[in-house]
Regions:
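Bacterial N-terminal signal peptides that target proteins for export
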Residues: 2-14
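Small disulfide-bonded, cysteine-rich extracellular recognition modules and tandem repeats
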Residues: 4, 21, 49-50, 88, ...
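Bacterial N-terminal signal peptides
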Residues: 11-23
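C-terminal region of N-terminal signal peptides and the immediate post-cleavage residues
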Residues: 20-35
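Extracellular/lumenal glycan-associated surfaces
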Residues: 41-56, 104-121, 169-186, 235-252
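Short, flexible domain-boundary/linker segments around small modular repeats
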Residues: 60-103, 124-168, 193-234, 258-294
Length: 294
């Protein structure tokens, strides 16, 4: 091969690698983690980040989970950013290899939305092994109106590896207010440690999780072409958000730069967010006994 041909090959390879990591470009998913091992290990610590409103964006959402498949499509307007949710481990239990490689890159920025009440009755069962060991009972709830749309972002320009990016960039969760039926839950203690590299130096936090306030369910935005192997896992991603309380903090706030990863929102500018202490904790659940496969 001539020197000129070799140079052209290297240039083409470099171009392909660049396309693979750019948030606004399409890329084929080489694979995805199996549904139950991934979903059951995804815990998100959610921080308040009020004060920023993105440029106007109107989105049409379609439900992905089989239990909610009959709910109609809806169009929402992206409002003020309210939370940033980042991946954590509970009580020192790190997700297993091959799963943690995906979990640690799930950062979701949550924006206010509005919509009509669906009044959908559900029974929620915990999936995470740490919570199941605590003996937390199933919760009987009614899913009310949508309150937030949580979409994937990167922090401080640190992108997931290409094979992970092609999966996490499609995670969109629509969060509905809940009416919890029966006796309020007894708060349960947990110790949270950060999994994402950007926040790895943050100390662990002791929290008490109280009542479930929201149920976040998987949706797809019109214009987002989700690969079949990615959809097979994401359709099972349901998180119940619980209010948490913490002790007095000795750690100062952290300022982060957020960049959108989903192709539909790639045109939106980067955002600044300041986080301090967690306000809620998203825990994986199954709806009406429908356990994710795998």
């Amino acid at each position: 091969m001539s020197r000129r041909s070799t140079s052209r090959c290297f240039a083409a390879l470099a171009s392909l690698m660049l396309v693979a990591v750019l948030p606004g470009t399409a890329t084929a998913a080489p694979g995805a983690p199996p549904p139950l091992p991934f979903v059951s290990q995804l815990d998100l610590s959610c921080y308040r980040t009020e004060g920023y409103k993105p440029p106007p964006a109107e989105l049409t959402l379609k439900h992905l989970n089989p239990v909610l498949a009959k709910l109609p499509m809806e169009t929402v307007k992206l409002g003020e950013r309210q939370q940033l949710c980042v991946p954590v481990a509970k009580n020192g239990e790190i997700p297993p290899p091959g799963i943690v490689d995906f979990v640690r890159w799930v950062d979701l920025s949550c924006y206010r939305i509005e919509g009509g009440a669906v009044n959908f009755p559900l029974t929620l069962s915990h999936l995470n092994p740490v919570v199941r060991k605590l003996g937390i009972q199933d919760a009987h709830v009614t899913m009310l109106s949508p309150e937030q749309l949580c979409v994937p972002v990167a922090k401080n320009g640190v992108l997931p590896p290409p094979e992970v990016l092609s999966f996490v960039r499609h995670i969109d969760l629509e969060c509905y207010a809940l009416r919890v039926l029966g006796i309020p839950a007894v708060p349960f203690p947990l110790t949270l440690g950060h999994l994402n590299p950007v926040l790895a130096d943050r100390p662990k936090v002791d929290v008490k999780a109280g009542n479930a306030r929201q149920l976040c369910v998987p949706v797809a935005k019109r214009g987002d072409e989700i690969p079949p192997e990615v959809l097979d896992t994401l359709q099972w991603l349901d998180l119940a958000k619980y209010d948490v309380t913490t002790g007095p903090s000795v750690v100062g706030p952290v300022t982060l730069k957020l960049t959108h990863l989903n192709p539909v929102l790639a045109r939106l500018p980067s955002e600044e967010a300041v986080i301090t202490e967690p306000a809620q904790l998203g825990l994986p659940v199954a709806k009406n006994g429908k356990i994710p496969p795998g």
